């Protein structure tokens, strides 16, 4: 049985507001390791941001996160790790997920830890723990929910 191979990534508003010239460079970096299956640029409404981050409601950073995520455009992307395509063709690797490779690629949530990790995107582009430039699904269940949130028909149209 194949594991879920997709993950949801988000390029957050800090990239689009303050570093817009870097978007193409960032997309190229992403495409060096991941296949982009879907992408769009949108601005979340307050209600959409509250729905997307409902699991964080009540946490100390929730209001700051909602305010930040609604201040400008974001780019949600559906990704799969390019190495999965190779591994799936060569053997039955049990690590058939893009979630961990994407989270490793973007690096730790916390800015200072991200800056210590050479080559991670958050270390290069993040400016604070909230304005950390990128989002990555934390689990298969989260990835499914998040992909359905931004791309409601993708998973049903891409069943294998």
UniProtKB/Swiss-Prot annotation:
UniProt-listed PANTHER family: NUCLEOSIDE DIPHOSPHATE KINASE, NUCLEOSIDE DIPHOSPHATE KINASE DDB_G0292928-RELATED
Catalytic activity: a 2'-deoxyribonucleoside 5'-diphosphate + ATP = a 2'-deoxyribonucleoside 5'-triphosphate + ADP; a ribonucleoside 5'-diphosphate + ATP = a ribonucleoside 5'-triphosphate + ADP
Single biological process term from Gene Ontology: nucleotide metabolic process
Keyword list, A-Z: ATP-binding, Kinase, Magnesium, Metal-binding, Nucleotide metabolism, Nucleotide-binding, Phosphoprotein, Transferase
Cofactor(s) essential for the protein: Mg(2+)
Active-site feature positions: 135 (pros-phosphohistidine intermediate)
EC number: 2.7.4.6
Source organism (scientific name): Dictyostelium discoideum
SMART domains hit by this protein: NDK
Record lineage: Eukaryota, Amoebozoa, Evosea, Eumycetozoa, Dictyostelia
Sequence positions that bind ATP: 12, 61, 103, 109, 122, 132
Keyword Transferase recorded: yes
GO molecular function: ATP binding; metal ion binding; nucleoside diphosphate kinase activity
Pfam families, alphabetized: NDK
Coiled-coil regions listed in the entry: none
Family membership: Belongs to the NDK family.
Protein name as it appears in the record: Probable nucleoside diphosphate kinase DDB_G0292928
């Amino acid at each position: 049985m194949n594991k879920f191979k997709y993950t949801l990534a988000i390029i957050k508003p800090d990239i689009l507001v303050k570093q817009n010239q870097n978007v193409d460079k960032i997309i190229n970096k992403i495409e060096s390791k991941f296949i982009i299956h879907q992408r769009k640029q949108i601005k979340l409404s307050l209600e959409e941001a509250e729905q997307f981050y409902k699991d964080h409601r009540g946490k100390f950073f929730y209001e700051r996160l909602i305010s930040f995520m609604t201040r400008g455009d974001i780019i949600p992307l559906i990704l799969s790790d390019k190495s999965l395509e190779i591994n799936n063709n060569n053997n039955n690797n049990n690590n058939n997920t893009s979630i961990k490779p994407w989270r490793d690629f973007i690096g730790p949530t916390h800015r200072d830890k991200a800056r210590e990790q050479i080559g991670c995107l958050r270390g290069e582009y993040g400016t604070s723990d909230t304005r950390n430039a990128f989002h990555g699904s934390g689990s298969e269940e989260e990835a499914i929910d998040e992909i359905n949130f931004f791309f409601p028909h993708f998973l049903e149209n891409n069943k294998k």
